[in-house]
Amino acid sequence: MRATKGNENVFVDCGFPPTEAENLRIRAKLMMALTGYIQERKITQSRAARIMGVSQPRISDLVRGKIGLFTIDTLVNMVTAAGLKVDVDITARSPRAKNKRVA
């Protein structure tokens, strides 16, 4: 077995185009934060839905990781409704990262 160092974004490693991979990475991070919020507070999906202003089935989709059903916009609204704060950090890519390939 041989290990290969991957990209900083697992979605790039899975073959997604860079822009789509970045969108997926951001959505996954937001979804993990919301799922963590629900688990840490030990609240029901119904309670989480009321807090976040969505339906219980939407919370079910969230905790089951149905990433394709959520936009960044929707997830940010849910995070904000939960009383959490979203910080955005934008940095320049290193020249090496742009040309880096996984063997």
What are these regions, as identified by a protein language model?
Residues 66-71:
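Short, solvent-exposed alpha-helical "recognition" segments
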Residues 41-60:
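Short alpha-helical DNA-recognition segment
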Residues 63, 90:
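DNA major-groove recognition helix of helix-turn-helix
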Residues 1-32, 93-101:
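N-terminal flexible/basic segments that precede or flank functional cores
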Residues 34, 45, 75:
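Generic structural marker for isolated residues within well-ordered, non-membrane alpha-helices
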Residues 72-88:
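DNA major-groove recognition helix of helix-turn-helix/homeodomain DNA-binding modules
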